[in-house]
Swiss-Prot record:
Purpose of the protein: Required for correct translation termination and probably involved in regulation of hypoxic gene expression.
Keywords, comma-separated and alphabetical: Nucleus, Transcription, Transcription regulation, Translation regulation
Protein name, per record: Enhancer of translation termination 1
Origin: domain of life: Eukaryota
Main localization category: nucleus
Region (Disordered): 1-41, 230-259
Localization annotation: Nucleus
Gene Ontology CC: nucleus
InterPro entries named among the record's database cross-references: Nro1/ETT1
Any one of the GO BP annotations: positive regulation of SREBP signaling pathway
Acidic residues: bias regions: 235-252
Pfam entry (one): Nro1
Amino acid sequence: MAKRTLGLAKAAKAKKQKKEQEHQEISASPDEESSSSNQLTIELPEEIDANNEISQLKGLHKTYLQSERDNELLVNGIIHECDRLLRENDSENKQPLPAVFHAIYAIALAELSKFHTEELDKVKEFFIAALERVELGLEKNPNDINLLVAKTKILLDQISLQYIAPLTLESDVKELDKEIDELLDAALSVYESVEARAKELKDYSIFDDSETLDILEALDDILDIVDNFGKENQGDDGSDEDDDEDDDEEEKSVELAETHPLYKIKNSDKYDQWWRDHTHLYLDNLEKLENGSPELKREVCHRLGQSYLQESEVPYSVFTTLKYDDEYDGIEELEGLTEKEAQKISQELITKALDYLKQAKDEEDPETWVSIAEAMISLGNLYEVDSKEQEDLYLEAEKILKRANNVTNGKFQEELDNLLP
């Protein structure tokens, strides 16, 4: 899987909102009496019906999702609007509020936790309130697919911010009221019910939405946090030494005790495989839509391509080491693989990666062209030197890099220089 340098909890902390000090107005609720002196003016998307309050709420929610998601004032604005609609609905005995209302309300409550990551009690309160809201929605709208998406998002964020963020290398599973792998299983089970519900309804439009795709990214973030857990703490002993090699060695040496809450997840391929399988299914569901988003499809294909490239790293390294490193002369295996086995596995994985990277190609984004060229070069390296297969791959990669370099005024010159003799 493609890994990130920052997991969800750190990214949330890094994107602390800037406090708004001026008196402003939330345009979605012009009649609302607010005791807060901090208000915000929001320009809603053009397609939003200004005369429909639920449509306005959806517009506020969409505005937040399309932003940097670093403005607590906007999240509070969504919550205040939900509170107003709820009070108004209760007092005037209107028709029950729709499922999407409960979904937006619950997600906004959970989002507040990302602005208070240092206050664990508040984080817990926000998630309790969010899950209560989504369950209320499900009571009134059983198996509603939007509510199931919201519940999955909230559960995954809760795992990251409430359960993983406070952990240290010394943490013990006995300190937690629930095991994290069981919480993760429960969250993923809810997402599987989203897939099942879409299949039952023969309506796959829920997957034509970046908010649904965020679920797979949230899982990827969690797995990334687990994979790298503790590494940032290594070397924080007050020493002024800054030796890159020592730092690399320290990062590689981090191991979790069997009693650590993250041990089971870190030492299992189960969740990586789940991510891969359900990302494939996501793509399948997108392709069932006649007018599905090309941007979303490219993004899913890019992620799949990167995941196969990452999986190829170990066998690729084994092959190049056994074949070209004189220090390993006479050694038959590394990582349980012979040279031939490593070569075959690497070729298969990078070929799969190339297929998805080509589907992810965007004519308006040269970076996507370069991803294809780099994968071609890696695949070429797995063939015999000067073989036809290698030369063909190198030539095609060179053409792609030259084109990308030309349209970006030399941005990829280094990649070209590395390829050309």
